[in-house]
A protein has these predicted regions:
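N-terminal lobe of the biotin/lipoate ligase/transferase fold
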Residues: 1-144, 154
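Short, acidic Gly/Pro/Ser/Thr-rich loop/turn segments
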Residues: 54-55, 157, 172-173
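Residue-level recognition of well-ordered beta-strand positions that form the cores
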Residues: 94, 151, 164-166
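Short, conserved charged micro-motifs
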Residues: 101-104, 161, 174, 198
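A translation/RNA-centric and nucleic-acid-associated enzymatic feature enriched
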Residues: 148
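Conserved phosphate/anionic-ligand binding catalytic regions in large, soluble enzymes, centered on
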Residues: 158-171
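A hydrophobic, small-residue-rich beta->alpha segment in the mid-to-C-terminal subdomain
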Residues: 168-198
Length: 198
């Protein structure tokens, strides 16, 4: 893991080049959150990818522990079920929300706009959908398709977990589930949209 220390921001930017096991990531975040809450460690933003897994949020109910031998992890984040794996960029935040007036809605709003602006740089028109969390765009068939997901949790005044952006991942894993609990939904990736001109 590479640490890019931005002293003036008081935030550590962590970059992992290898796939990070989900158990390790959760353990790391929970320890870091505890230290941030105590003022021992700086806030952090972590860029990584996971091996192929499914994760479920607090509002998802299932007794299964795998889907086609891909493990399912029950998490404490918001949301339902989604897939993570190679080709999907994960960005985990460990941010003291107390310093930001405990405004979680504003934090989510800023994250969503950040993703939309980044995709716009790639000439991908992305947008939010009413009453749904995440970022959407049109897939190659003109369907509304999710390209980025968000799931957050707060502990001791520190927000953690984060967002995922589909860059060049296999979309077949999403077809085995109702992504984020939305039936008959479509999922896409940056590569899927741009492959004809890349």
């Amino acid at each position: 893991m590479k640490i890019i220390n931005k002293k003036h921001l008081q935030i550590d930017f962590l970059v992992s080049k290898n796939l990070v096991p989900y158990d390790y990531a959760i353990n790391f975040m929970e320890h870091r959150v505890n230290y941030i809450a105590k003022g021992i460690e700086k806030e952090a933003i972590w860029f990584l990818e996971h091996p192929s897994i499914y994760t479920t949020g607090r509002s998802f109910e299932s007794k299964a522990d795998n889907i086609d031998n891909i493990p399912i992890y029950n998490t404490g984040r918001g949301g339902k079920i989604t897939w993570h794996g190679p080709g999907q960029r994960i960005i985990y935040f460990m941010i003291n929300i107390k310093k930001r007036n405990n405004n979680i809605r504003q934090f989510v709003f800023n994250l969503e706009n950040y993703i939309i602006n980044c995709l716009e740089e790639l000439d991908i028109i992305a947008y939010k959908k009413k009453n749904l969390i995440g970022i959407w765009t049109k897939d190659t068939n003109g369907n509304d398709a999710k390209i980025a997901s968000l799931g957050l949790r707060v502990s001791k005044g520190v927000i953690y977990h984060g967002l995922s952006i589909n860059i060049n991942c296999s979309l077949s894993y999403f077809r085995k589930i109702d992504p984020c609990g939305i039936k008959n939904s479509h999922v896409t990736s940056i590569f899927e949209i741009k492959k004809n001109i890349m």
